[in-house]
Structures are given as structure tokens and as C-alpha cells.
Amino acid sequence: MLYSFVKVKTMNYQRALTLTLLALSGVVLSFLPSCSSCSKGTGSADSTALDSANLTLAWDSIVIDDTYYDNPETKRGPSVYVNIAYLYPKGDSALIHLFNRFTFGDSFAQLSPQEAVARYIKEVETEYIYSPDSTEGYTPEDLDKMRSHLELRNKIHYVDSLVISVEKMLSTYFMGAVHGMYGSSISNVDRKAHSVISEGDLFVDGYAADLSKILQRYALSSYGRKTQQELEEKEGIYVSDIAPNDNFTIDEKGLTYYYNLYEIAPYAVGQVKIFVPHEALVGILRPNSLLYHYLPETNQ
């Protein structure tokens, strides 16, 4: 019965897989609790703090942990388990709109966090719970086993007076799939401009080729390998595929690039992270690039 289900549901799985990949490549699994006062980011991956009195950020969160059914009255039939932990800034509507956009998509930007979460759950139900006309021919027990899941969380990697670096983590499984999908989407906010920071804001025109070489070089050091061949053979990472993807965190030490499943390595390798110190990027920085603020004076 499972095999026939997989065949029937191939198109639905492909759609869900596409949605997952698009969500991760769009404008983003530990959850950070809300905080009302913060200290300056120290560069740790879990930093949520800011110490400056006039730049203090207050945080709030919405947590959803529930299962949604095709038949909510009886709680029977196809279902989707949804776990959402949404951390967002309080008291700054522009930042809230950016966080909504990062986490849920462009069309959610102008909603309140509560409205955004509620609408997102409705969309998840539509995409991950099978409609009745697609479940004909199955017993009630078969339908009860048609379970999908979606977990969505965001995390603050680093905060200071210049930037907020946010990671969105999405994990999905669509019933009938061989395996689930997971990955991260990073967004960086220019705190003064209330705008999203892209590679084009940081680096000179035509930066891609030089940045690719830098990333490939630091991939070796990140994984403790001496040659590209060794990295490919021992780690399964295709060095020639490593290129800028606008998916990076910023902190006071450097940039960490994230590559999701299948980007530069097979599924089994998992997510790949490459750290590049700010000093290695001096040659391709745009004049007045925000990253100059993190360089020692001798390199500026």
C-alpha cells in the first residue's frame, strides 16, 4: 500500500519539495527565548544581546506545537505536524516587517507577527494535508498514517549597533517522500538603514570570481583539508561548485557561508558551512562597505 501511495503522491511531494527549496532560497534548530534587554554581541553563534542603551532591542516570540488534521473534529485522516518558534523584535514596525518577510515570505511582511503565523499555518495545511479526492481507495487506518511535518525556527546569530544577522531554519517531510528536507536561509539587516544587506552592498562589481576562489580556499581550512581533491574525496564537497550564494552570517570575526542540501554536496553530507575572516575580503570590499568597521585599522 505504501508503494502505491508514493506513486500517486509523487506530484504533491515534488511540489512540497519545491516549496521547501524556494523558502530556503528566498529573501530563511535551537530556539532562543525572548529577552527584554541584551548586551553587545560577542560573536558567539547564539548571541542575541546588545549593550548600548539607545540601541537595546526587545524580543518576543510565538511558539506553535500542534497537529492539524484533514478532519479536525475527529482528528483522523491525513495530518501535518507543525512546530514553529518565531522570534521577532518588539516595538519597531520596520524590523517586524523585515522579520516577517525573512521568515514567512514577502506577502507576509505587512502583517502582525500573530497574523503572519496564523496565515502561514493555513498555507501549510493546504500544501501538506491531502485533499479528500486524493485519498479515495484508502482505509481509515491508511489515511491516519499519511503524516507530514514542518518545523520552522529563526535564530539570531549576531547583533551589534550595525547589523542583525538572522538564520531561518526549515525542516519538512511530505508523506511518501524518501526523506525529509532541511536547510537554512540567512538574512542580514543594516540597523541604520533598516534594509537587507546583500553581497552587492559589501563587495565591488564583478566580485563573484574572486569571492569564489576565496570561499574555495577557506573551505579547505574549514574542514582541515590540504587539497581540493582531498576535500572532495574525504568530505564529499564539490569544490568547483562553491560560489557566492548570498547566504551568509555576519559577525565581528567574518562571514560564514551556508550551503544547503544538494548545493555543493550530496544529501548525505548535510549542510556545509565555510567561514571567511574579514581580513581575507579586503581586496574585494566596496568603498564604504559595512565590513570595514570590523577590520583592524592597519587593514583599512
What are these regions, as identified by a protein language model?
Residues 36-300:
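Compositionally biased intrinsically disordered regions enriched in Thr/Gly
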Residues 1-48:
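Bacterial Sec-dependent N-terminal signal peptides
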